[in-house]
A protein has these predicted regions:
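Surface-exposed, active-site-proximal loop segments in enzymatic domains
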Residues: 13-30, 60-74, 203, 233-242
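Cellulosome-associated attachment modules in secreted, modular CAZymes
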Residues: 257-319
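Substrate-binding cleft of secreted/luminal carbohydrate-active enzymes
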Residues: 163-252
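Short, solvent-exposed loop/turn segments at secondary-structure junctions
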Residues: 15-19, 114-115, 195-199
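Short beta-strand segments at enzyme active-site cores
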Residues: 5-16, 48-54, 188-191, 224-225
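Substrate-binding cleft of extracellular glycoside hydrolase catalytic domains
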Residues: 1-47
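Active-site region of glycoside hydrolase catalytic domains
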Residues: 29-162, 174-194, 217-220
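Extracytoplasmic/secreted proteins, especially bacterial periplasmic and envelope-associated proteins
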Residues: 27, 31-34, 38, 84, ...
Length: 319
């Protein structure tokens, strides 16, 4: 946050206790409630660049409904429990005070699976602030996007990019657009990616870039999962791969017509932009609608001192 980054905080596996929800709901819900009460209290005064997410991939239980079978036994019950937990999450955060009353919240889909989350049984929670987005993950096809070596459930695939692959990607992105984006619900693809071991380099570039563009073109936010540092050097704050970096930059230029912070629209973010924003807040200069959009570093529709601070930090960090 000090570096003007967006941060998503969620519960992520945590030893697997969430798997016990179907058999020990009271204990699990109590633990879930206590965790989010404490997190909400600790971060209640943080700005909107901090997002809370209800869960990672753990909402959905094969012990209630076996998603891999053709049976629907237990399906409604399993979805109802997912919906109940997500509603509990929203209620806890909204009741905690501070900026949590309007904080952007990310609602975990059913197993963060696109097919299952687009099912009518999945329901977005009621939110008085109307600041909820849905979270899904994309690792399809799994033999390319997950496997590095042959496994019991499939053989590793080294290439990606056939017409069928592109059609499959567009099919899933269209599903999300129809189920959520077109209804005013933002979508964050909170994880997508693929390994590089035993993969064709051109296919890796194409897959990562294609998913990114498919999401951006439908006004969804893709987040590349790279905790192992395959593509991004966190110590140097730069991409390892210049080809992938160039691909991403082209996508941003194509689908993002506003460069946040570039208030004077000269193509870069400098101290001149900070001065211009300060002059606007002091009512010495007026901003056009496009300039005001670029100045809204917090993306909250309001220009104030928080935007000046964030913009100044950006200039100091990257110059």
């Amino acid at each position: 946050l000090d570096y003007n980054l967006h941060v998503i905080v969620n519960l992520h596996y945590d030893g697997g206790w969430l798997a016990n929800f179907p058999t020990d709901k009271e204990t699990c819900m109590t633990k879930y409630t206590r965790i989010w009460e404490q997190l909400s209290d600790a971060f209640q005064d943080y700005g909107d660049y901090l997002v809370f997410e209800s869960q990672n991939e753990e909402l959905g239980w094969d012990s209630l409904w076996n998603r891999w079978s053709s049976s629907t036994d237990g399906k409604a019950e399993s979805y109802a429990l997912v919906n109940e937990i997500n509603q509990k999450f929203v209620d806890i955060v909204r009741a905690s005070g501070g900026n949590n009353a309007k904080r952007h919240l990310l609602i975990s889909g059913y197993g963060t699976d696109i097919d299952l989350t687009c099912d009518p049984l999945f329901q977005m929670p009621q939110d008085p602030a109307n600041h909820c987005a849905v979270s899904v993950h994309y690792y399809t096809p799994s033999d390319f996007a997950i496997l590095e070596e042959d496994a019991s459930w499939g053989k590793v695939r080294s290439t990606w990019g056939t017409d069928a692959d592109i059609q499959q990607l567009n099919h899933y992105m269209d599903m999300l657009q129809t189920a959520f984006v077109d209804k005013g619900v933002p979508v964050i693809i909170g994880e997508y990616g693929c390994p590089k071991k035993n993969k064709d380099a051109d296919s890796v570039w194409l897959f990562l870039s294609s998913v990114c563009e498919a999401a951006y073109s439908r006004k969804m936010c893709p987040v590349m999962w790279d905790v192992t540092g395959l593509h991004y050097d966190r110590s140097a704050c730069q991409m390892y791969d210049s080809v992938l970096q160039e691909n991403f930059q082209k996508i941003l230029q194509t689908y993002n017509d506003t460069k946040i912070g570039d208030i004077n629209q000269d193509g870069s973010v400098t101290i001149a932009d900070v001065v211009l924003l300060q002059q606007h807040l002091l009512q010495e200069k007026s901003l056009t609608a496009a300039q005001a959009k670029a100045a809204d570093t917090w993306s909250d529709g309001v220009l104030n001192g928080f935007d000046v601070t964030a913009l100044r930090q950006t200039v100091l960090t990257f110059t």
